[in-house]
């Protein structure tokens, strides 16, 4: 498997021998490794390069605007307004792949169509809702809820027994969206004025709620709060604590999703409850694709690349590939007709809803998470009127995108590992030099993947900065040369060290500034060198600055120097932004010398 950064400045679509190269930009580096391998094996005539866009549509827009878009791009957090902005750069999948487009369930592509052009295909969807400890329900004779009123009653029964009814990390944006959309879909968004609002939202209309819509959402939250289903304490709970309480039998229900395997530590039986409404017939599955895929319009202008991409898409959305995606999930729901996905015992209770395709797909714009969080927080922490609730939500949901230019780049630098020099990322060299200049450090070591996208010449907005920099805190320490060598050795060791269940090493490769490094062929005896080429003095003291990933690696590898580092007030992003405002970025510098075997 070939892994890279978020893109490169040249070589798009290069061939390797007689093979075509297809670039696929995924939303991270680590998920669905078995599925990636399956796709590669089904396309032996192609070389697939997997890139990482960090689940950031702005990264895709940034690269597309500079003519450096991957052939296939995927995103998990699908935002309608961001997708509309990217649409001019995307191929028409309905025209270019009509057979695959026709395989999707009627209506499932509505939110992925812009100006009559099908721009995205959704991969199988996860379901989010309530996990109930069925053993507790049976033990105390509590009815498994099928309506919102029955959910209130169940929570009341458990609270009277000293058991928390429902625990939810209400401050998380994705949970707020689940509460507002999932528990109001059947009663509002699926009919009448609510349906009209949703149609407009998906078509690029105003995201602001009407007076009626705001009142409906506020009333649902208010009722859940008054009944004890939701509590102010839910704003401060985190997912780990919620799960621990559920596993120990202290909580009867939690919010959870189907895209991972859940094994109750207590051995209790668990059952999934979908989103509820006024009647049992209002039960509905709240879903969203584990990713959605689009194709570069430019790619489809090349007949050979177009055929290669069609081949990859056909494999990606085949029933067999979707089942591979489901191997590490309790259940996924396919948006394609005729693809039956496996479901675990936890989801047997909603097998009928799955068979009936009684679901909806989560709808977002770039502000939906923050707007939902603010609205839920206001209701749980206070007592807003319907008008106050609606005004707050609308203020957040309609916040305009900040397009102000914050600086300009005078250079270009790629971010793909090994693109210009072995084991180096040129853009990461630029970042490391900026940190050194701002902190006065003798040496800087940062995770090279913090350079999340290539640097292009020209103006930059805040969205561009978030696309370019995977921000990390910075730490500093005064170390002896011997201690510094130990830190560097473990930073390199981290490139071949894997944390539990992670398919990526804890460090990609460190980028350096202020010093260079000589890397031996056998991995033993790597040395740091001063700017004049001499070795560092083991007894001298050096001011070192590292990024958070490097510090984590030191702690993970139990390096005794990890505790010597203290947090700096600035981050990678803030220092880069300050330097960018001056319009003079440093040129990339070589920081590794590799031993050449004779």
PLM feature spans:
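Extracytoplasmic/periplasmic substrate-recognition and gating elements
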Residues: 41-42, 265-328
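A structural signal for short loop-to-beta-strand junctions that line the ligand-binding cleft
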Residues: 62-63, 71, 100-135, 164-170, ...
């Amino acid at each position: 498997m070939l892994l890279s950064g978020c893109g490169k400045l040249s070589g798009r679509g290069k061939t390797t021998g007689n093979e075509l190269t297809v670039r696929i930009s995924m939303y991270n580096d680590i998920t669905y490794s078995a599925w990636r391998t399956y796709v590669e094996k089904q396309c032996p005539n192609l070389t697939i390069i997997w890139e990482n866009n960090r689940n950031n549509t702005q990264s895709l827009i940034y690269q597309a605007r500079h003519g450096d878009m991957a052939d296939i791009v995927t995103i998990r957090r699908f935002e309608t307004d961001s997708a509309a902005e990217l649409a001019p750069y995307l191929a028409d999948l309905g025209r270019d792949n009509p057979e695959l487009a026709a395989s999707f369930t009627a209506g499932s592509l509505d939110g992925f169509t812009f100006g009559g052009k099908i721009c995205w295909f959704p991969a199988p969807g996860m379901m989010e809702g309530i996990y109930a400890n069925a053993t507790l329900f049976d033990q105390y004779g509590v009815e498994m809820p099928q309506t919102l009123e029955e959910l209130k009653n169940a929570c009341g029964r458990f609270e009277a027994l000293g058991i928390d009814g429902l625990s939810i990390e209400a401050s998380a944006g994705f949970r707020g969206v689940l509460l507002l959309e999932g528990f109001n879909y059947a009663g509002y968004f699926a009919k009448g004025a609510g349906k009209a609002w949703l149609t407009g939202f998906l078509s690029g209309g105003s995201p602001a709620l009407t007076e009626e819509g705001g009142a409906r959402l506020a009333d649902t939250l208010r009722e859940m709060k008054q009944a004890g289903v939701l509590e102010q304490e839910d704003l401060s709970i985190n997912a780990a604590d919620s799960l621990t309480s559920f596993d120990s039998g202290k909580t009867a229900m939690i919010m959870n999703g189907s895209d991972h395997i859940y094994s109750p530590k207590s051995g209790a039986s668990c059952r999934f409850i979908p989103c509820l409404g006024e009647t049992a017939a209002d039960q509905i599955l709240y879903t969203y694709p584990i990713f959605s895929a689009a194709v570069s319009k430019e790619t489809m202008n090349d007949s050979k690349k177009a055929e290669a991409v069609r081949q990859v898409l056909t494999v990606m959305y085949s029933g067999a590939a979707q089942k591979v995606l489901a191997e590490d999930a309790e259940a996924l729901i396919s948006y394609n007709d005729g693809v039956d996905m496996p479901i675990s015992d936890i989801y047997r209770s909603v097998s009928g809803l799955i068979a009936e395709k009684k679901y909806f797909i989560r709808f977002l714009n770039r502000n939906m998470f923050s707007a939902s969080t603010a609205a839920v927080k206001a209701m749980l922490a206070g007592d807003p009127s319907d008008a106050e609730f609606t005004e707050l939500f609308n203020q957040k949901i309609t916040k305009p995108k900040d397009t102000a230019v914050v600086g300009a780049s005078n250079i270009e630098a790629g971010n793909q590992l090994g693109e210009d020099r072995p084991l180096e990322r040129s853009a990461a060299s630029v970042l490391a030099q900026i940190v050194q200049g701002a902190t006065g450090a003798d040496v800087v070591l940062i995770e090279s993947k913090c350079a999340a996208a290539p640097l292009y010449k020209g103006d930059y907005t805040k969205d561009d900065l978030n696309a370019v920099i995977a921000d990390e805190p910075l730490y500093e320490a005064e170390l002896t040369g011997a201690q510094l060598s130990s830190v560097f050795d473990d930073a390199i060791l981290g490139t071949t060290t894997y944390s539990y269940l992670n398919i990526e090493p804890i460090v990609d490769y460190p980028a350096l500034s202020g010093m260079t490094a000589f890397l031996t062929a056998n991995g033993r005896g790597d040395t740091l060198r001063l700017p004049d080429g001499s070795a560092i003095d083991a007894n001298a003291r050096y001011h070192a600055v590292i990024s958070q990933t490097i510090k984590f690696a030191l702690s993970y590898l139990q390096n005794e120097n990890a505790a010597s580092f203290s947090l700096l007030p600035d981050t990678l992003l803030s220092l880069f932004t300050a330097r960018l405002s001056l319009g003079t970025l440093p040129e990339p510098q070589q920081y590794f010398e590799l031993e050449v075997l004779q």
